[in-house]
A protein has these predicted regions:
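Conserved amphipathic alpha-helical segments that form helical-bundle/coiled-coil interaction surfaces
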Residues: 8-11, 15-18, 22-88, 101-109, ...
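Anionic, Ser/Thr-rich low-complexity intrinsically disordered regions
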Residues: 96-100, 118, 128-129, 133, ...
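A short, acidic/glycine-rich surface segment
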Residues: 90-92
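Short linear motifs at protein or domain termini
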Residues: 1-22, 64, 130, 134-166
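Bacterial carbohydrate/catabolite-sensing allosteric modules
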Residues: 26, 46, 94, 113-116, ...
Length: 166
């Protein structure tokens, strides 16, 4: 189920960003910084294919930076499963710009050695991608009925920590 994949992926991406905060190398930091710079450039030019590739590379660099082979393997599997739809959502100018901004915020949290903030931002980044996929009508690409708005909202109010659940 796509919803489950995004829910699990959001948590694992958060964990990955958390771990990367203390384990990332200088070279990986430079890769992320360059990635964001290039993403902004290609977004201004309307190059959606390049931005989709840069988005993939951003996540791959983050997976490497956490230095956990098992976590990287799990995230790559989830990432690959939703790749087709991700390319379509990233071709949307608004989502592409939002995604780049979210990457930049994750990068800044890692750079500033703020593991909890990096975790929260990475988690929210995946949730935002999921919400955009549903709003764009791409959920059906997996042969599934789209959830109702209340089914996919990430409830962080009052300490809630799940998709549509408290």
């Amino acid at each position: 189920d796509v919803k489950d994949i995004y829910m699990i992926r959001s948590k694992l991406e958060g964990l990955c960003a958390f771990l990367a905060t203390t384990q990332i190398t200088d070279e990986q930091m430079e890769e992320l910084e360059e990635n964001i710079y290039l993403s902004k450039f290609h977004a201004k030019k309307g190059h959606s294919e390049q931005n989709a590739e840069l988005d993939n590379r951003f996540h791959e660099t983050l997976y490497d930076a956490c230095h956990s082979k098992m976590l990287k393997h799990q995230l790559q599997d989830f990432h690959d499963y939703v790749l087709r739809v991700r390319k379509k959502t990233l071709s949307q100018t608004q989502r592409s710009a939002e995604s780049i901004k979210e990457h930049e915020m994750i990068f800044e949290a890692i750079k500033n050695k703020q593991p909890q903030e990096a975790e929260k931002l990475a988690n929210q980044h995946i949730i935002n991608a999921y919400k955009n996929m549903v709003r764009s009508g791409l959920y059906e690409a997996y042969g599934q009925e789209p959830p109702k708005e209340e089914d996919f909202l990430y409830n962080t109010e009052n300490g809630g920590d799940s998709y549509g659940q408290d």
